[in-house]
Amino acid sequence: MAVPVLSSIAGFLGITSLRATGRDAYIIITLRSLRMFTSGIPSLILALFFASLNFQDSRIGVFMTLTLLGDVLLSLLLTLIADKLGRRRILFGGSIMMAFSGVVFALSENFWILLIAAVFGIISVTGADCGPFRAVEESILSGLTDEKTRSDVLAWYVTFTTMAGAVGAEVAGRVVHTLEKRHDVVKAYHALFWAYAAFGIIGSVLCLGLSERCEAAGERRTEMQERGRGGNDGEEEEVLLETMTPSTTDGFHHEEGRPARRADIRVPPQKKQSYFSQISKSTRSIMYKLWILLAIDSLADGMTPYSLMNYYVEQKFHVSKATLGDITSASQFLCAVSAIFAGPLAKRIGLINTMVFTHLPSSIASAFIPLPKTVGPTIGILLFRAALNSMDQAPRTAFIAAVVKPEERTGAMGITSMVRTLAMSVGPSITGLLSGNHMFWIAFLATGTCRIIYDLGLWVLFVNVKVGNKPTAREDDLSSVDDEAWNGLLSDSDNDSDFSSEGRKSKDLERTQNTV
């Protein structure tokens, strides 16, 4: 009795889907959890580190801005070429760049050297995940799953990484508090950057365990095999895969010693493929609308991040730093727990409905944060908002994966990440201006309004977009295989028939001559 019950619970929570996806999913989730755990190190100590080196505040501001800009541009570039260069190579190279930045910060105290390492390397200045990792990882997970398991696996991806970020922020905060009591603070900060570099090395080692299934071509190959092409069609399948896929077959090495293909199967000449992902017109028509809505939502998130909400609560109610830390930890914990249920909910009411019906109450709560006159109700609204705030993340990624062709998925997710980051970076400046004029409450009202516009826009524009059993972009792409490939295969079959027909004719003629 206990086994069926546990099996049902595992199926409901998406654990069965996660196990079915395999080792690659575990490695991807571990990679991002590791990064989220370590992202708190630079975000907490960078300003303190620069202050200990007597850098001017204006230089620190320039450093943060240029680092964010460099991260956006580098991330966009790497995600656009990830499918061609190899997704595993991008993840491996990004981990090495993360380690490189940590080593430079551990060894150098020169402002310009540190700036170059931050702009051209990967280091988090906001406490959030940075670099090209998330877009590539979400693309990989989307390719490893199908429409039935995707939302479950992505929900666990969000859950584990959010929890790791919460634990990492708590650990980093306590470590920094301990280090502040030491006399040689600079050396202590250098030691933390060595730890940051070490986590980058660990991440690069984990990348070596990823299989070929993570690549765009490996994803296509698995998909073709699942479509049931028989044993005699192996050679044709190989031709079609090479014709259809502009990507590498794997991220680290090229297969050698592959058996020679039959000479009588002609492979049509392929056009030279660009290293950059090509976003088709059909994809752009959907993503343009979604990008505009996501920019509005990200602007709202940037106006009232956790740091500014804590500042508002501290200024209004004069609570202790420990209380603020407890509120933040509780909020992140609720985000992580609630994300578990996003997958099961999406399978029952749909991706868009899950995004809207969970995010809309959170959006309304954001606008009501300034209303309470006491700290208790304010904290209650903050926690209610946090409990529903992240439930749209996994369904959103699953929706993008469903409406975008597989070969365009990584590039589309990279552009999505760039749009969100740029829009989010504008928010704190707006809130700063409002706070300076004693109108902080307007920032919360504007946040709620923008988020409600995002939610209603999602529902109006996308609620009727079917992503279930209809022939989506993926199947359209598979069913519309390059005509030249089919023509080449058909003409080969015709030629084989002609050759056999001519052979029969010559034998008949020879038999007739012998009879005569």
Label every PLM stretch briefly.
Residues 10-73, 286-294, 298-327:
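Helix-loop boundary and gating motifs at the non-cytosolic
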Residues 89-104, 353-368:
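Structural signature of the two symmetry-related core transmembrane helices
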Residues 47-48, 165-187, 343-344, 426-445:
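Transmembrane alpha-helix termini and helix-breaking/packing motifs in multi-pass membrane transporters
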Residues 73-87, 176-177, 338-351, 435-436:
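Helix-to-loop junctions at the C-terminal end of transmembrane segments
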Residues 2-22, 217-298, 315, 481-484:
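Juxtamembrane intracellular "pre-TM" segments in multi-pass secondary transporters
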